[in-house]
Amino acid sequence: MKKHLKIIPICFLSALLFNTAKAQAPKKDTINVGTVVGLMRDSAHNYVMQSATMAIYKQHSNDLVSYQLTNNFGRYQFKDIPVGIPLYVVATHVGYQSIKKEFLISPKTKSIDLKTLNMERIDLSLKEVVIKGQQAPMQMHGDTLEFNASAFKLDTNAVVGDLLRALPGITVWADGVITVNGKKINQLLVEGKPFFGGDNKIALDNLPKNSVQKVQVYQDKNDPDPINPKTNMNIVLKKDKKDGLFGKFGFGYGSLDHYAGDGMLTYFSPKTQVSVVGAFNNVNKIAGNVDELMRFNSFKGDGINDDYHSDFRRTGTNIFRGGGATFSQDFSKDADPRQSYYKTNQLRGEVFSSDLDNKTLTQSQTVVSLGDNSHLNQTSDDTQHSNDFSLRSNGTYQKRTEHAEINADYSVNNSQSISQATQNSTSLNDQNQDQSRNFAQQMATRNATDASGSFGINTNRYNNWGTQKNRSINAEFKYTFNLTHSNEDSKNITNFTATDTTQDKHFNRQYVKNIDGGTHTFVTNFKDITGLFQRRGNKFLQIDINNTISLHHENENDKVGDLAPGATTYTPNRDLTNVSHYKTIDDKVGVFLSKNFWKTLDNRYSKSWRVYVNLQGQIFDQKNEAQQTFQNIKRSYSYFIPAADFTYRNDQYGEFSKNYSLGYYTSVTYPTISQLAPLVDNSNVYSITIGNKGLKPAYKHIAYANYTYYDQKNKNPLNYKIELSANLVKNNIADSSNYDDLGRSVHRFINTSDSRSADYNGWLEKAFNFKDHQLQFSTNSGYSYSEYTTNVNGRDYLTRANSLRANASVFYTYKSIWQARVGENFDGSKSNQIGLSRFTNYNWATNLGLGFALPRSVFFSTRVDLNNNKTSSADHNIYYTIWNADVGYRFLKGAEGEIKFSLLDILHQNKSLQNYITANSLTTTTANVLQQYFMVTLAYYPRHFGLHKKKE
């Protein structure tokens, strides 16, 4: 079995390389092209030479014409090779002398057989022609596929992303995902290490092509999933380009006093990575961490994707200020990057601060169905001003050896928020015309500190071949914690009036809330217990024993007071003032049984099967002690929550990879204190939630089936995935609502009859490569159907809900000069409460994009989004268009300077329109948004690579 595991990566990459070779240089005119065939052999033993690199060049210019690898039988066949001109072929293989053979294809025969070429080992005298300094475009190095960057000529300002797009069989998709002949790259590494957190875009858009020595593709031998091992890509830099400095400093000013500034300075070396970033603007460019700002400030960061354009979907007017730094330090000794898994010894940290000021004006309209053709028509006008500040730091440490792994991480976030809000609401019953109004004001300040972290140790059993005894054990030990502390002071002023004046209510209520809580989780997993009693291999079931226990506590202190009319001091509210201590214990114990099977044939196929069953039980205890005695609750539950899965993988090297999986698992949702016995605040006049101590846990059954296909046949990959699932929930927890004629509602959670749902998700992507052109087609879609029971005004209604989302896009690129995109997006939902209500809502969006960038010169990009919205409560569709455009010029050496003119929301049509559907209501909300402005931006991109140059 272990032998099979070692063979699989080698077979896979050999086949991958062979097919990469078939994705050759650009096709020629079929009238003036021919074929070249031949055979490669080892001169000493007369073996056929597998995976030898064959490259054809023009004699007069040494331009590369085409290249490929020999197959399992040492043969090669070139098609579409120009006829009637002098050519030569260069053959290379690791451990052998390179050889050269000159030839010319006759225009009459349009084919030539080069017969047998013999390759000699490096330590033998050379009888054929030796080619010194001639590098093959690609080759096999052990089980690693290598591309030589110098064999591919690109613009002097090209970056790694441009290089990868020029490599045969490699596709860089529009979202940054990389595939090699359809196989998704799990990690893009630089010098065997993640590059600034592992975001592909940072390496693709910043590292220059001329700093790259080679690109390696290999399977992760140590992937814990033997059925579906992951594939990595490693960028090897030239010896004199191992370190570098890059960044951006930019500022823009535009109409209506709009402004935007951002900066980044990044340094990397073989052991150290450091980046400092910052941004400030009032044009809805908001980032949540250092990685986002690094991605937005990339050297080739602009295009038609609108990664760092204004977010016109964000509501309100926003002023953002943020900045931070990230660093990583590698303490491991220098080693082959392909073996870096066992050499990992890395520390990484980040600190990030953000300050966001938001002012939002919102209008909403809600239609609530009450049955018997009765409806509530509710409107609301809201004004909110908030300021949110946060300071977050986090760090990770990882160390791996051949038989053990240590992981540790932490995160601390301090946040402060100040908010003020006013709300004017009305409710009208269309049957009896009863009407009510509510005016509410809220002022709140909140300070919170959240901390989390984990520490884990994994050990691997290995065999001492001298004593034939097992050493160590396969085990996982992990501890995680989440802690929170918050203080909140707030005041609510409410004035409720109605046509029936006896129902008028007035509140001036003050709240002081303090919360301290935390969760501590301990994971213990002993793997492959049966292997402890066997010396060689494991011929029986693999048995794992696992236990996960979580201890949660939350202490809450609420002080609530009311200010009576004419009074000057707040009187304590005895119903809402409370001290509570909530604790839960969640313990899951299981026995995990699994069995793997393999069937392989070198360079042909690999088939694998895996079956597992997880026999797991769960014990859940909850206890709440409170000053309000009705909240004193103590409950214990125990459930059997099994899971099972069958996975089959079929890799036909050079053809396809298929993955099938079928499975079933269970889970339990337990009632919370806020559902069982909440504190009822009657100042929330329009919506009050009361408790239900009879609420039972909901038990969920989930069955699923997945199918994934990856094409490995040619340079035009087709990949797709289909996911199906079905859910059945026993004792489903649902909302029970009671409305009065004034629009006031009382909500209560209840257990209803079984709920059912079914879901579909899928995606497909196809790429076409021809010469310097690439066309990408991608689509993904999802559908969800559910049936459940709700209760409105004491009557049960069967509710059927549907939702559908679908999008498709076509993305075209020509070299790194032209880009174009056309896309369609649909998102719709429907809710049908049998005998009560029917609501529908959908959004259509069409987006068009075009961009070009002349080398070291002018660039232009534009994007148009056409939006169409329709709801069942509106008489007409709502249409609006967002059109943005940029034109700019790159100057200075290395295109390090930039001036850009941006036109945003050119048609001045941007709107914020959102729809929410519940079982018996439909809400449409509009808000103020950022609209048309123009801006001029200046930017400088410092770029220096090879700060401490070493000789090759």
For each of these PLM feature ranges, what is it?
Residues T70, G198-K201, Q219-Y259, T272-E952:
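Primarily recognizes Gram-negative and organellar outer-membrane beta-barrels
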Residues I31, V37-M49:
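Structural motif
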Residues V177-K221, N234-L237, T272:
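Periplasmic plug
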Residues R41-A44, T53-Y57, V90-V94, I112-K153, ...:
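Short, acidic, small-residue-rich periplasmic hinge/interaction motif at the N-terminus
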Residues H60-R75:
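Short, acidic Ser/Thr/Gly-rich low-complexity loop/linker segments typical of extracellular
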Residues M49, Q77-I85:
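Short Pro-Gly-centered beta-turn/loop motif in secreted/extracellular proteins
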Residues K58-D63, I85-E102:
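A short, solvent-exposed loop/turn motif at the edges and junctions
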